[in-house]
Amino acid sequence: SEMCIRDSFLAKQLDNFLHRNPATADALKKRIEQNERERKELAGIKKLANERAKKANLHNKKLRDCRVHLNDELPAKNKEAFIATQKDTTIFITEGDSASGSITKSRNVDTQAVFSLRGKPLNSFGETKKVVYQNEEFNLLQHALNIEDGLEGLRYNNIVIATDADVDGMHIRLLLMTFFLQFFPDLVKKGHVYILETPLFRVRNKQETIYCYDETEKQAATKKLGNKPEITRFKGLGEISPEEFGRFIGRDIRLQPVILEQGDHIQEFLGYYMGKNTMERQDFIINNLRVELDLID
């Protein structure tokens, strides 16, 4: 048949190419053998980890789930309205009890879920897929998202990394982004991953309260309210009350999309920022170090 002829032709061309390029053939052989070893190693780990995750999911203390999910079956009536609600489904990935508590108390229980991390997650750069199953938090997160076998069963349209705006919070963001880029890059490519922007300052007087997301906004608010308004700097998400937090994850939510540019450069990108601490990276940090100054006395 035509397909057999085509397959035979391709096999012959590939065979000729590999004979002419022994280095490529050797690299391909090693890669195939490595994949086979990883596949066998992963099979046993997956079975054990999935059994643990199923038990944990029944009483998953890390997940405060919502009522509607992206992968829910459509109802017989009001399909368009239900699809619109599904597009709003969001899971906030937070760190620590105080931050997750504030979001949990102020969220929309129909469409907003909360997954709480315990401290900083593992740096998964350079790890194989087995770490997703061996690391309890990653395994539970994978099951909460329902992405083990692909994105078809994804339970939330928006995956929002919600961390403090300090150095530790930024590090946790990078660790989570590394996890998604390393093992689930399609989540990023298809626009499902975001960073939650939360205000750094609250500027208020007796008549008005203004929330500011950077120093420039703070200066403008201070000038607008005049007469020495009260200025509060939020050091962490846990310092924002649930009543206030509801404003920042509601209709006026500010989300920064995680965008992956076209090209096969994920590993190079992650290697530079999340790999070994090279002299090149040390020089970059020294040359680009910025000290934050409060511009208003």
Residue map of PLM features:
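C-terminal or mid-to-C-terminal helical accessory/interaction module adjacent to the motor/catalytic core
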Residues: 215-271, 283
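Glycine-rich loop/turn
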Residues: 62-82, 205-236
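Alpha-helical scaffold elements adjacent to nucleotide-binding pockets in ATP/GTP-utilizing enzyme cores
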Residues: 9, 13, 137-140, 171-179, ...
